[in-house]
Amino acid sequence: MNTIEVIIDLRPKEPWDGILIAQLSELGFDGFLETRQGICAYAEEGLNVEEALKQTCLYEGGFEFEVHQKLIPAQNWNAQWEADFEPVYVDDRLSIMAPFHDLSKAKGLLIQIQPQMSFGTGHHQTTWLMSRALINMSQMPDRVLDMGSGTGVLAIIAEKRGAKEILAIDIEEGATENARSNAELNKCSKITALQGDIDLLKDEKPFGLILANINKNVLKAHMSEYARLLEPGGTLLLSGFFESDVDELVDFATKFGLQFVDVNTNETWAMIQLKK
């Protein structure tokens, strides 16, 4: 299927780029790139782009913007990503790069991600926050769950840091296939990537670490299951929401016996760490 590319230039860019990505992700767009001027958003052909944009912050005022869109034939999708995909560095301890980059410039742990439509290349603030948290963990638990795994980058980092069994789940078939390919690219053998939702976890034994980089509403809907699946003393890392949502999520999590440990932010985005 052909893909619609919507190029949105913003003046100023921040914090509106992150807000737009969050809003458009709930309006039919399933791929994003940050550019120097704003963002590129991608959706399947047939989406009413004009109607979707009317439901975002674009028309609330306070900043200037320009919107351009074009149709990308399906066979050109990867070429488009390759043209825009740049390496991501996390505190000089982690490099997220594509195979076509100059890998000799990697700093710290090198993770290779073949850019496709799946979310999670490290460019978005939430993926960066989660990646940083994994790099900074003193000891990686044996069993890790990655919900909304996208490209599989977090699952791959977890294995490279010592996890012995990682379950990566995403609702999108394309994301699951991408995660499997990226696991193979990084010579990972301990990752099981499955397509589905929280229902797949009914018979799973507890995890020492659960990662969930989705959005606030889904996180709240899944919270009881995260609490059930987390072993005593285990860690839950949540992201995919704004700094303004932190108190709401922390208060909600305490209802299920989860204790607040820490919060980290990047621009307007946040990640919270909880323990059972």
Q: Can you say where each PLM-predicted feature lies in the sequence?
A:
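Conserved beta-strand segments that form the floor/walls of ligand-binding pockets within enzyme
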Residues: 5, 95, 110-114, 129, ...
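Generic structural signal for residues in well-ordered beta-strands
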Residues: 32, 65-69, 96, 111, ...
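N-terminal auxiliary segments of SAM/dcSAM-dependent transferases
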Residues: 2-105
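SAM-dependent Rossmann-like transferase core, predominantly class I methyltransferases
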Residues: 76-140
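S-adenosylmethionine
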Residues: 132, 171-276
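Conserved SAM/SAH cofactor-binding pocket of Class I
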Residues: 117, 121-202, 206
